[in-house]
Amino acid sequence: MEAFTKHTGRAVPLRRSNVDTDQIIPAHWLKKVTRDGFEDGLFEAWRKDPEFVLNRPEREGATVLVAGPDFGTGSSREHAVWALQNYGFKTVVSSRFADIFRGNSLKNGLLTVVLDQKTVDALWELVERDPQAEITVDLEAREVRAEGVTASFELDENSRWRLLNGLDDISITLQNEADIAAYEAKRPSFKPQTVQV
């Protein structure tokens, strides 16, 4: 997992609330379990509309999604996180996220930033007025900065530490690989074993 310390990028203003995971990526995209190749499924139904915000040329290459409240509701699917990342988003800003989506995001390296709705509105206005405006999300300082906007955000210490160090569940486990191997070597042969394939 790539470490996240600070990111500056242009933004997509997604003025929709209650965006569920099926809208983020429809169920027919969930047949594979690799983490890549989901960018075309991101907001698939909405992208059929030529006026949808992601279809606008001035939004191409944007890396910050500024979403409406209750983003990521619905069923738990890591594919929704992977689709956002595959498209190029490094962080999502909203006034409220579904708990399971937020947990999946943080465990997969996508920083979800909760700001009050007034601040989200100010970011929307800024990036709609100037599509080239950049937003900085600084995890070290726990701050979002843009022209005319400076806002602090909270994130639990464990999630912050994992993101700053680029650590997912597997990489954290592998930090103890020698201890795991030593333990397995001493286990009686009649007990179940893990075997590298």
UniProtKB/Swiss-Prot annotation:
GO BP annotations listed: L-leucine biosynthetic process
Record-given protein name: 3-isopropylmalate dehydratase small subunit
Catalytic reaction(s) noted: (2R,3S)-3-isopropylmalate = (2S)-2-isopropylmalate
Membership in a protein family: Belongs to the LeuD family. LeuD type 1 subfamily.
Keywords: Amino-acid biosynthesis, Branched-chain amino acid biosynthesis, Leucine biosynthesis, Lyase
Subunit structure: Heterodimer of LeuC and LeuD.
Function: Catalyzes the isomerization between 2-isopropylmalate and 3-isopropylmalate, via the formation of 2-isopropylmaleate.
Entry keyword annotation includes Nucleotidyltransferase: no
Lineage: Bacteria, Bacillati, Actinomycetota, Actinomycetes, Kitasatosporales
Pathway listed: Amino-acid biosynthesis; L-leucine biosynthesis; L-leucine from 3-methyl-2-oxobutanoate: step 2/4
Cross-referenced InterPro entries: 3-IsopropMal_deHydase_ssu, Aconitase/3IPM_dehydase_swvl, AconitaseA/IPMdHydase_ssu_swvl, IPMI_Swivel, LeuD
GO molecular function ontology, one term from the record: 3-isopropylmalate dehydratase activity
HAMAP family: LeuD_type1
Organism name: Streptomyces coelicolor (strain ATCC BAA-471 / A3(2) / M145)
EC annotation from Swiss-Prot or TrEMBL: 4.2.1.33
